[in-house]
Amino acid sequence: MKPVIALVGRPNVGKSTLFNRMTRSRDAIVANLPGLTRDRKYGEGELEGKHYIVVDTGGITGEEQGIDAAMAGQSFTAMNEADVVLFVVDAQAGVTPADEMIAKELRVRGKPTILVVNKIDGMQPEVAAADFFAMGFQEYMYTAAAHNRGVRSLLEKALEPFPEQEPLEGEDDSGIRIGIIGRPNVGKSTLVNRLLGEDRVVVFDQPGTTRDSVYIPYERLGERYTLIDTAGVRRRKNVSEAVEKFSIVKTLQAIKDAHVVVLVLDAREGIVDQDLHLLGFAIEAGRALVLAINKWDGMSQDDKDEVRREIDRRMGFVEYAQIHFISALHGTGVGHLYESVHECFDSAMAKWSTNQLTTLLEDAVSQHQPPMVNGRRIKLRYAHQGGSNPPLIIVHGNQTDALPNSYKRYLENTFRKVLKVVGTPIRFEFRSGENPFAGKKNKLSPRQQKKKERLMKHVKKLKHKQKRKKSR
C-alpha cells in the first residue's frame, strides 16, 4: 500500500503550498468533491521510486461553527486515514491556541507525527522553532515551502519508515483485478457479494488501517479474479447498513491496482458531480472502464429513458466505456458484467507488433492525409506499442507537435475500430525526429557567392526590360 501523508494545521500556515511542492513530481490527482470531501484535496507524488498519497486538509482554529466545524471534522478524519501526519505551523506567527489544540488532538490519537516549522525565511530555524518544542513532538523539520527549501528532506523523513512498494503479483497469480468504485450507498457492497456468490461467507476483517482496500481472490467458472473492494471493512451481516464508509484513498488505490474499473452508479438518484469526479480518476489513470447502472429494477420506462439520456449528455466524453443496467440486489444483469470485464481486460493488455501498427498507420494516412504546416505536409512514418493498461501507441514522424487534435482523434478512432479495442482508452504519443540543420544558415563558398550575384543581376535586368516594355 502507498503511505498516506496528511497535512494538518490551522489556516494560512502554508499547507497548500507544501501540498503543491510534494505533488509536483507527477501530475497530481486532485479531488474537490462536493459535500463529503470538498474540504480535502488528495494528490499523488513520488520520491526516488517511493509513491505516496498526500491529503491537504482544511484549516483548524478550534472555534469552528456550522460548515467550518464540518471541515475541521474532515481534517480529523484525514488524521485517521494517514500513516504519518505533518503538523504544519507558522514560525513567524509563533504558537497560537489553535496550534496547541491541534497538538493535543494529535497526541490523543497517537499517530506518527512530524512537526513542520514552516516560513523560516530569513530566520534562525532553531530560534524560530524554540516555542514549538514545548509541544513535545520528537520529530521536527524546518521548511520554507514557498521557496521549496527543506521540502525534499521533509519527504525523505516522512517516507523513511516505509519500504519501496513491491509490484503486485502478475496476472498468472491473481487473475484479472477488478476495482469496484462508487460513491456511498450506490450498492457497491451488494454488488461485491453478488459477484462473489450468494453462498460464500464473506469476512473482510483484515489487519491495517481503515483506509485499506480489501483484495479478495476468487474463482468463477475456472477463471481467476481478484476483487478490489473499497466499500469498507465489514462482515456480511452488516452489508445492509444504510451508511457506508467512503474514502478517496481507497478509490485511488483500487483504480491504480486494477486492470478493469467498475464504476457503480445509482439509477434512481441519477448522475451527480461526485460520480463525475470518480470517473475522472479512472480516466486520468487510463483504466479500462465498465459503468454499472444499479437499482434498474422497478423503474418506469420514462424514468429509464431519462437516465439513458442523462448518461449520453453527461458522460458522452467517455464513449469507450462499457455500460450495463443491473440490479445488484436481485442479480439482474450482473453475470453480463463478467463478459465486459473480459473484453476490457483483453483490450487493455493486448500486444501488437510494430509491423501491424505501422501498416495501420500507413492505411490511415493514405485515406486521410495530415494537414500542411508552413507549406510542408506533416509526415507520420511508423508506429510501435509503448505499453499496456492503457495501450500506448508511439507514432514517429516530423512536425508531429503541430498535429491538430482533430487528426489525433481520427487516428484514435481508426486504431480503435481496426484493432477492435473496447472498454479502454488508447493513448498516443507523437515524436518528431530532430532536424540537424534546424537554426543553421548555409554558408556559401566564394564561388557560390559569385554565382548568386550573377543570378541577381540577371533577374534585375529582366525586371527592368519588362518595366520598359510596359511603359511603351
From Swiss-Prot:
Keywords: GTP-binding, Nucleotide-binding, Repeat, Ribosome biogenesis. GO terms for biological process: ribosome biogenesis. GTP 2 binds at residues 182-189, 229-233, 294-297. GTP 1 binds at residues 9-16, 56-60, 118-121. Residues 3-166, 176-349 form the EngA-type G domain. One of its GO terms (molecular function) is GTP binding. The keyword Glycosyltransferase does not apply. SUPFAM superfamilies: P-loop containing nucleoside triphosphate hydrolases (SSF52540). It holds the Pfam family KH_dom-like. The keyword Lipid metabolism does not apply. Residues 350-434 form the KH-like domain. HAMAP family: GTPase_Der. PANTHER family: GTPASE DER. NCBIfam families: GTPase_EngA, small_GTP. Associates with the 50S ribosomal subunit. This is GTPase Der. It comes from Hahella chejuensis (strain KCTC 2396). The gene is der.
